[in-house]
Amino acid sequence: MNITKFLNKVYFAPRLKEIEQYAPLPLQESFDNAGVQVGDVNQPATGALLCLDVTGEVVDEAIEMGCNLIVSHHPLAFKAFKSLTGSTYIERCMMKACKYDLVIYAAHTNLDNAAGGVNFRLAELIGLENVRVLSPQKGALLK
């Protein structure tokens, strides 16, 4: 989905902060890697592509559509790289994103755990009542 008009003549950082106000990064699980995966958030936005998973095809589509922001639910990389050589699929996606000045941003378990986030919305859609947190995160208000 191209939301170019929404992002026209704005910078990423303030828009990404809006996402993080709704789904704060501290709500992510310890295994997760939500937030900016790669890219310079201080560049002007040309458009955004939303996806569930970042793939090579998604990166190519963003480039073809002139979108320099990819917002994904699942992170492209869950762990830090020791080197970036292009020897793996994920590394090649990251390198191509860098080459074309793309920003990749993931809102994963922080969005799942947010009040009104994915899990709350799914519960609402299937008609659950009295929805409550089953296992609160230590130091967090919601899970």
Where do the PLM segments sit?
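Hydrophobic structural segments
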Residues: 1-143
